[in-house]
C-alpha cells in the first residue's frame, strides 16, 4: 500500500446568477498546491452538468493528485431534496476535469416551485479533498479508498421513508401513498434510476398538488402557467399524469370563464358608476337652477 503524504480539504460555495450562459466557471480556489474551480454547463442535452477542474498551467510537470469531491445543489424549500453527488479521480496532465454530465435535469432545476432556484439564482456547495501520495496506488488499492465515482449520496441529516422507490419525508408518506392508491400506474413509464433525481420529480409533483389545492382566488395567472409547465415536464419525464392534466385543463377552462365573466361585470360596474356620477352632476345642476329660480320671488 502506498504511503499517503498528506491531504488538503476545503469546502466552498458558488452562486450562479445566470443560467442562460452556455458555460459558467467559479472563482479558482487554492487547495494544497493547486487551484481548483467548478465548471457548469446549464443545459447540456437537457441536463445541468457540473465538473471539478484543476488549473494545469500552474502545476509542475509530472504532477498527479488523487481527489475526492462532493457537490451539492441546494434546495431552499426542502434540504432533503438537495441534489448531492460524490466522486473520486486521479487528476494529472491527461485528466484536468471530472464530474457529472447528468447532475440534474434542467427542467427540474429551472422550475421555481421545486426549490433549487431562488431569486433567479442557484447555490452549489463543493467539498474537495486533494491527496498527495508518495507512491502510486494500483487500481485495486484505489477501490479500497473510495466508492464508485457515479454514486449518489443520501442526506444523512434527515430521516426519510421509501415509498415505491422514492425517498420522502415522514410527513409526506400519507400523501404519496394516497396518490399511488388512486393512480397505481403513476410510474409505469418512469425509468429514471438516479435516486436524487427521482426524489426531485416526486417533490415537484407534491408541490404541484399543493398549489392546485388552493382556491382559484389564491392562484395567479403566473401560478397557473407555472403549474402547466410543471405538468408538461413531469409527463415528459415518464410520470403518468393524464388524470392531473385533465383536471388541470378543466380547472383552467373554468378559471378563464370566471375571469372573463368577472371582467365583463367590472366593465358594467364602471359604466354604471360613471352613469351615476353623471346623474349626480345633473342633479346638482338642477338643484342649483331651482335655487336660483326661487330667489326671484324674494
From Swiss-Prot:
The keyword Signal does not apply. Keywords: Coiled coil. InterPro entries: MATH-CC_domain_protein (IPR050804), MATH/TRAF_dom (IPR002083), TRAF-like (IPR008974). Residues 240-288 form a coiled coil. Disulfide bonds: none annotated. It comes from the Eukaryota. CDD domains: MATH (cd00121). The keyword Coiled coil applies. It holds the Pfam family MATH_2. Residues 9-128 form the MATH domain. This is MATH domain and coiled-coil domain-containing protein At3g58280.
